[in-house]
A protein has these predicted regions:
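N-terminal Rossmann-like NAD(P)+-binding subdomain of aldehyde/semialdehyde dehydrogenases
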Residues: 1-95, 123, 251, 442-459, ...
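Short beta-strand/turn micro-motifs at beta-sheet edges
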Residues: 5-6, 92-94, 120-121, 222-223, ...
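Structural signal for hydrophobic packing residues in well-ordered secondary-structure cores
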Residues: 15-18, 22-25, 33-44, 48-51, ...
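Conserved C-terminal structural/oligomerization subdomain of aldehyde/semialdehyde dehydrogenase
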Residues: 22, 293-452, 456-465
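Rossmann-like NAD(P) dinucleotide-binding subdomain of oxidoreductase/dehydrogenase enzymes
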Residues: 86-212
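ALDH superfamily catalytic-core signature
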Residues: 192-310
Length: 465
C-alpha cells in the first residue's frame, strides 16, 4: 500500500519534473505529446481487455474505441493548437505568456479506467504539467499499466523523469490527503463525488425519424454497457409515436418490459433506495437474469417504462447500466418539462438529447435544459463525446500579460517568434534520486512540523491502508 510519506515523495518528484518541463518549447512539447498519444493508441486493445477483465464493467470492443479517441483522437482534435508559445496581439499591443499550473492529480474511475488516464495525461503534457495518477482501487492494475505506458513514452521522447507517475495502491484517505496537499495544483477528478453524474434525458417528438432515432438510442445506450456519463438515462417519447419507436428499438436489441417486469427490475436495482453497484457496466442479460426476468440472449438494452418523472421514481435516476427508463407524454411542452425534470434529478450541468425535425422544438428544448450540451439526432454518447473529457487545456494554464501603452503613437517592438522557452539539449533530465523513498530536500516547515501529506490532514489517519 502506498503510504502518505511515499505519496508525498511522488508529489515532490512531480514538482521537480514540472519545473523542468515548464521551460520546454512548443516543438519539443508537441513531439512528446505525439509520442505519448501514439503509445496509448498502440496499447488501446490490450488495455481495453485488461480493464474489462479487472473491473467486470463495460465491453472491451467499445473501450478500444474510447482508448483510441482519447489518445490520437485528442491529438487530432487539438492539432494546430499551441498552449506553449506566447500570443501576440499587435492591434491591442498585448503579449500573453502561458504558464503551466504545475502538478495535476488525476483521480481516475473504474468505469473508464484507461481512457481517462489517457486524456488527462495527454492534456496535462500538452500544457507542460506533471501528472500523478490515483486509480480507483477497482481498476488499480489497468490504470497503473496505462499510466506507466504513457510515462515511459514521455521520457523516451525527452520529457523529464517523473513527469507522469502513478500511485501503486490507492485509498480514499490517501487521495483526500493528496487533494488537500499544497503541492497539488490541479485536481482532475472523474467519477468521484463532486464530479457531476450524468442523468441524460432523450426526447423523441412526433416529427422525428423514428427508425433512425431508435437505432441511435439503442446503440448509444448499449455502448460500453452505459458506463459513461453521456449515455442516455431516460427516454421521453410522445404518445403518438411510442408504439412505432418501441417496435423499432426492439429490432436493434432492446427489450421493452411490461409494468410488472419493470417493478421487479426496479426492486433489484434499487433494493435499498440506492443503485446496486453490482449492475454498473454489466450486460443487459446479466441484469435481467438476476432480476428474475427472461429475455433473449441478444438483448442489449432493457427499457423500463414508468409513469411520472419525479425524485421518488428510481428509474428516473442515474443507472450506469444498459437500463433505459421510459415515460410518455402527450405533447412537446410536456416532453420538454419531463426531460428537464430528469436533468434536475441528477444531471444538472451535464447534457441532454433530442430527436426531432422541428427547429422550433429543438430550440425550445435546448433553451429549457439546464445543461451546456444538447445533442440533436445522434446518440448522446457519440454526440457529446467531448463532454466526457471534462478537463480542458485552458484549465491547466494561466497567462501573464505584457501590455504596452495603448497610445497609437507609442510603437510596440516586433515580438513575433520570440519565446522564453528553450529546446532542451543533452540527456533527458533525470530525477536527482532514483528512488521515490528518498527526499531530495527537506519539506518546508510550519510551527515546527513539515507541511504536506507526510503529516495527515485533520480527520485522516496517517497510517498504511
Amino acid at each position: 500500500m502506498t503510504t502518505l510519506p511515499h505519496a508525498g515523495h511522488l508529489l515532490e518528484r512531480a514538482r521537480w519534473a514540472a519545473r523542468a518541463y515548464a521551460d520546454y518549447d512548443a516543438v519539443t512539447v508537441s513531439a512528446i505529446v505525439t509520442a505519448v498519444a501514439d503509445a496509448g493508441y498502440a496499447e488501446a486493445e490490450r488495455l481495453a481487455t485488461a480493464a474489462v477483465t479487472e473491473t467486470g464493467m463495460g465491453i472491451a470492443a467499445d473501450k478500444v474505441v474510447k482508448n483510441r479517441a482519447r489518445s490520437r483522437g485528442i491529438l487530432d482534435y487539438y492539432r494546430g493548437a499551441d498552449f506553449v508559445s506566447p500570443r501576440v496581439d499587435t492591434a491591442r499591443k498585448i503579449i500573453e505568456i502561458p504558464r503551466p499550473a504545475g502538478v495535476v492529480l488525476a483521480v481516475t474511475p473504474a468505469t473508464n479506467p484507461v481512457c481517462t488516464v489517457y486524456s488527462t495525461v495527454i492534456l496535462a503534457l500538452m500544457t507542460r504539467n506533471a501528472v500523478v495518477v490515483a486509480p480507483d482501487p477497482l481498476a488499480q492494475n489497468c490504470s497503473a499499466d496505462a499510466a506507466r505506458t504513457l510515462a515511459d513514452a514521455a521520457v523516451k521522447a525527452g520529457a523529464p523523469d517523473g513527469i507522469v507517475q502513478v500511485i501503486d495502491e490507492s485509498s480514499n484517505s490517501l487521495v483526500e490527503a493528496l487533494m488537500a496537499d499544497e503541492r497539488t495544483d490541479v485536481v482532475a477528478a472523474t467519477g468521484v463525488a463532486g464530479a457531476g453524474p450524468g442523468n441524460v434525458p432523450v426526447f423523441v417528438d412526433a416529427s422525428a425519424d423514428i427508425a433512425a432515432a431508435a437505432r441511435r438510442i439503442v446503440d448509444s445506450k448499449a455502448f460500453d454497457n452505459s458506463v459513461s456519463c453521456t449515455n442516455e438515462s431516460v427516454l421521453v417519447a410522445e404518445e403518438s409515436i411510442t408504439g412505432a419507436l418501441c417496435s423499432a428499438m426492439t429490432r436493434h436489441g432492446a427489450h421493452i418490459l411490461d409494468v410488472d417486469a419493470a417493478r421487479r427490475l426496479r426492486a433489484f436495482m434499487f433494493a435499498d433506495g440506492h443503485l446496486n453497484a453490482d449492475v454498473v457496466g454489466r450486460d443487459a442479460t446479466w441484469i435481467a437474469a438476476r432480476a428474475g426476468l427472461r429475455v433473449t440472449p441478444d438483448t442489449r438494452v432493457l427499457v423500463a417504462p414508468f409513469e411520472h418523472v419525479m425524485a421518488e421514481e428510481m428509474l428516473a435516476h442515474v443507472k450506469m447500466s444498459p437500463v433505459l427508463g421510459m415515460t410518455t407524454v402527450s405533447d412537446d411542452a410536456r416532453g420538454i418539462r419531463a426531460a428537464r425534470a430528469v436533468v434536475l434529478i441528477g444531471g444538472a450541468a451535464h447534457s441532454a438529447a433530442v430527436h426531432s425535425e422541428n427547429p422550433s422544438l429543438i430550440t425550445d428544448f435546448a433553451a429549457q435544459m439546464p445543461v451546456p450540451r444538447v445533442s440533436v439526432n445522434v446518440g448522446n454518447s457519440t454526440g457529446s463525446a467531448a463532454s466526457e473529457v471534462s478537463l480542458q487545456p485552458q484549465g491547466l494554464i494561466s497567462w501573464t500579460r505584457i501590455a504596452y501603452d495603448s497610445d497609437v503613437g507609442v510603437a510596440m517592438p516586433n515580438f513575433a517568434g520570440i519565446t522564453p522557452w528553450r529546446t532542451p539539449g543533452g540527456p533527458v533530465p533525470r530525477y536527482p534520486h532514483a528512488s521515490n523513498d528518498q527526499r531530495t530536500a527537506p519539506l518546508p516547515q510550519r510551527n515546527g512540523h513539515p507541511i504536506g501529506i507526510t503529516e495527515a490532514p485533520a480527520g485522516i489517519e496517517g497510517h498504511d491502508h
